[in-house]
């Protein structure tokens, strides 16, 4: 189970089907076979807090201008009724320019969900391209070499 994914499953208990949240899986020492599964029964739960993965879509304008896109957060903590828990939260980053950041406050939560993370927290950044310092160092070395040669 990848980190941050909220898996809802149906489990039969005493002949009754219940919606459960898969909380944890323990695997055997070879890592292939599950030996224990923790479920959280959501039958009588109105709302639950879960981490949901973020899916970034689009190419940021800043990347097209030579910048680098860097995701900072990969999940968001949301509070929602079990039936409204999304598999992922899709975030369009095509509007991010050079040197701009996307914050939690900029994300519209899915219907019925509330994002619990700090609104000021940075979700992703488009860094400006780094200036090439290598060319300047080579120029400086050439000048030094010329000075030594004439001495």
Curated annotation (Swiss-Prot):
Pfam families in UniProt: Ribosomal_TL5_C
Gene Ontology terms: cellular component: cytosolic large ribosomal subunit
Gene3D superfamilies for the chain: Ribosomal protein L25, beta domain
GO molecular function annotations of the record: structural constituent of ribosome
Region span, Disordered: 131-151
Record GO biological process: translation
Functional note: Not known. A homolog of ribosomal protein bL25, it is missing the N-terminal domain which binds 5S rRNA. In vitro does not bind 5S rRNA.
Name of protein: General stress protein CTC
PANTHER family, per the entry: RIBOSOMAL PROTEIN L25/GLN-TRNA SYNTHETASE, ANTI-CODON-BINDING DOMAIN-CONTAINING PROTEIN, RIBOSOMAL PROTEIN L25_GLN-TRNA SYNTHETASE, ANTI-CODON-BINDING DOMAIN-CONTAINING PROTEIN
């Amino acid at each position: 189970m990848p980190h941050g994914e909220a898996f809802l499953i149906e489990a039969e208990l005493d002949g009754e089907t219940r919606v459960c949240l898969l909380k944890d899986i323990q695997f055997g020492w070879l890592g292939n076979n599950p030996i224990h599964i923790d479920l959280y029964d959501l039958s009588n739960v109105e709302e639950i807090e879960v981490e949901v993965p973020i899916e970034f879509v689009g190419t940021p304008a800043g990347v097209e201008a030579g910048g680098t896109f860097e995701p900072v957060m990969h999940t968001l903590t949301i509070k929602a009724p079990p039936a409204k828990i999304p598999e992922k939260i899709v975030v369009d980053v095509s509007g991010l320019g050079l040197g701009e950041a996307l914050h939690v406050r900029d994300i519209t939560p899915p219907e019925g969900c509330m994002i619990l993370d700090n609104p000021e927290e940075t979700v992703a950044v488009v860094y400006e391209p780094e200036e090439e310092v290598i060319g300047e160092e080579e120029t400086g070395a050439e000048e030094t070499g010329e000075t030594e040669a004439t001495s």
